[in-house]
Amino acid sequence: MIKKIDLHTHSTASDGTFTPSEVAHKAHKTGLSAIALTDHDTINGLAEFKRACGEYGIEGISGVEISAKYEKEMHIVGLFIDENDTELAEKLDELKNAREVRNKKVLELVNGQGMEISVDNILSQKDGATLLNTGRAHIAHAMVKKGYVASVDEAFKKYLGKGMSCYVPRKTYSPKESIEMIKNAG
């Protein structure tokens, strides 16, 4: 019998739609025998995810997707990591804290363009949202909702995309640093 697995999923701990428990539930409902949670730059949802996988009788694989940059931005997925690794957690917290600073800077720039987008407008885009787990896409959705742009695509092309007036680069690690973090945690 062929077993179905999914080794790359996201939850509301990063940019996913479902909570870590809901990801496990959906995996169970679709007949997966194993699933990995690989949220962007965080391992915060792994404990809840692993608990839920155990309840549903499926193999829950601890993972992470780390933002890295070498000439261009890339994402490096690590599987079978130790979700209790303090060094990895600290490094990922640095990225998370940098995300909050970046979001505030982007909001300042957007508001400097005459748009009135508040932190609450951003947080209302996602259940369980904080400035630590939201990003430019959530700001773009708020811009659409308030009528400043017609689409998320327009928000990125005019304001939020690389080289545009409201773009702020994000903190990343090098691929070497990212791989070392994953190796040390696995």
Predicted regions and their residues:
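Generic alpha-helix signal with a bias toward terminal, lower-confidence helices
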Residues: 19, 44, 49, 70-72, ...
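Alpha-helical scaffold segments that flank or form the walls of functional sites
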Residues: 22-38, 87, 94-112
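Domain-core and long-helix interface of multi-subunit machines
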Residues: 6-14, 18, 30, 101-186
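An N-terminally biased module of ancient metal coordination in phosphate/nucleic-acid-related enzymes
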Residues: 1-73, 158-165, 173-186
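Short amphipathic alpha-helical segments, especially helix-boundary/capping motifs
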Residues: 1-2, 23-27, 80-85, 96, ...
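Active-site gating loops and adjacent loop-to-helix segments of metal-dependent hydrolytic enzymes
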Residues: 67-100, 141-164
